Curated annotation (Swiss-Prot):
ANK repeat ranges per the UniProt record: 52-81, 85-114, 118-147, 151-180, 185-212, 213-241, 245-274, 278-307, 311-340, 344-373
Pfam families, sorted: Ank, Ank_2
Alphabetized InterPro entries for the sequence: Ankyrin_rpt, Ankyrin_rpt-contain_sf
Record-given protein name: Ankyrin repeat domain-containing protein 65
Lineage: Eukaryota, Metazoa, Chordata, Craniata, Vertebrata
Keywords, alphabetical: ANK repeat, Repeat
Length: 395
């Protein structure tokens, strides 16, 4: 629920369906709940986590009926009742944004850190759905800001992913907020904010030391968040940060064809000559992906068109193997060696033919590729041509 709604809900003006009930009204509502439950049981179509299958207290909380909730608690209803998903009345009150019920349940001893079957606490629900006023209330009552669900996500992860800046501020101000805590995939709140392009949250996390700038920069590049890249670089992120296989941020962006991101990185000093653990440069990655605009940009910035990876393959090899005819043509225009011998002495023409890319092979032949050069096993590209032509005719 947006933060802008929370003040209206807690201003003393009842929202529809949340008015206090008289004792008579409560009894009438209780009978209605009985009828609804009986109808649901008779239908047999509702699961254990749907309102129709809940007990009276959970249903009353879901509908925001403060008077009925009060009566049920007086009659001995358990404040720790659970639905089929393991959620307590407090979870549901937070989820629905019923601030007055959140207060009431806490006053009646509801466990502020109770976790459902997915490991989510009421504070997780507040970070995802609820008004910021609810989060403040939960935190004042000692809700653990660093609680993790089964996926390893804290409330801060959720709030950051959604760009809920005010909520993030509340969570960062709490004891042990865990801004550097990583989830099951190794992502911090900063990673989630970068993936979603949540600029205000990124600024806030950066000011609080909650962002691992190198890996967050990689996420921003993979997600195509050019504005986030600029912010992170301004905060001191290393422009040539590397991922687990040694690819630089520029390499990641190039492999995905993110030209705008690449421009930002190059303007901030990214080195196009750096390679990953396999010896592949950003140009290798762009060529392999068939990203013509990325290839053109890197070539214009001086990327070496004949650089070889650990298998001896050049960007032209990668383009030919993928059948990326426009990229192949552009690399040739930039002076790429057409008969470069790579792994097993294979040329770009060998790879184009082996992988069934007739048009690319024809382009290479028209530009002077030799059909008679042999691989280490003695194979010539021209020997593959009849088979390739046969495949094309069949298709």
């Amino acid at each position: 629920m947006p933060d802008s709604c929370c003040f209206q809900m807690d201003s003393g003006v009842s929202e529809p369906g949340e008015q206090d009930l008289t004792e008579a009204g409560a009894e009438q509502e209780l009978r209605w709940l009985d009828l609804g439950s009986e109808e649901a049981l008779g239908a047999g179509t509702q699961g254990p986590s749907t309102p129709q299958a809940w007990g009276h207290l959970l249903q009353a909380v879901w509908k925001g009926h403060t008077g009925l909730v009060t009566q049920l608690l007086r009659q001995g209803a358990s404040v720790e009742e659970r639905d089929g998903a393991g959620r307590t009345p407090l979870h549901l009150a937070v989820l629905r944004g019923h601030v007055s019920l959140v207060r009431l349940l806490l006053q009646r001893g509801a466990q502020v850190g109770a976790a459902d079957r997915a490991g989510r606490t009421p504070l997780h629900e507040a970070a995802w759905h609820g008004p910021s006023r609810v989060a403040e209330l939960l935190l004042r009552r000692g809700a653990p800001a660093n609680a993790r669900c089964l996926a390893g996500l804290t409330p801060l992860h959720w709030a950051a992913a959604l760009g809920r800046t005010l909520m993030v501020g509340h969570l960062l101000a709490a004891p042990h907020p865990g801004p550097t805590a990583a989830d099951a995939r190794g992502w911090t709140a900063g990673h989630w904010a970068a993936a979603g392009g949540q600029m205000a949250v990124l600024e806030l996390l950066g000011a609080n030391g909650g962002a691992r700038l190198d890996s967050v920069l990689l996420v921003a590049a993979a997600a195509g968040r050019a504005t986030a890249l600029r912010l992170l670089l301004a905060q001191g992120a290393p422009v040539d940060a590397r991922d687990g296989v040694g690819a630089t941020v520029l390499g990641v962006a190039a492999g995905l064809g993110r030209r705008q991101d690449m421009e930002v990185l190059l303007e901030h000093g990214a080195d196009p000559s750096l390679t990953d653990r396999h010896g592949r440069s950003a140009l290798h990655r762009a060529a392999a992906g068939g990203h013509l605009l990325a290839v053109q940009l890197l070539a214009a910035w001086g990327a070496e068109v004949d650089s070889q990876d650990l298998l001896g393959l050049t960007p032209l090899h990668h383009a030919a193997r993928g059948g990326h005819i426009e990229v192949t043509g552009h690399l040739l225009d930039r002076g790429a060696e057409i008969n470069a011998a790579g792994w097993l002495h294979k040329t770009p023409l060998h790879l184009a033919m082996e992988h069934g890319h007739g048009p690319t092979a024809e382009l290479l032949l028209s530009r002077g590729a030799s059909p008679t050069l042999r691989t280490r096993w003695g194979d010539m590209a021209q020997d593959l041509w009849p088979a390739l032509c046969g495949e094309q005719e069949e298709s």
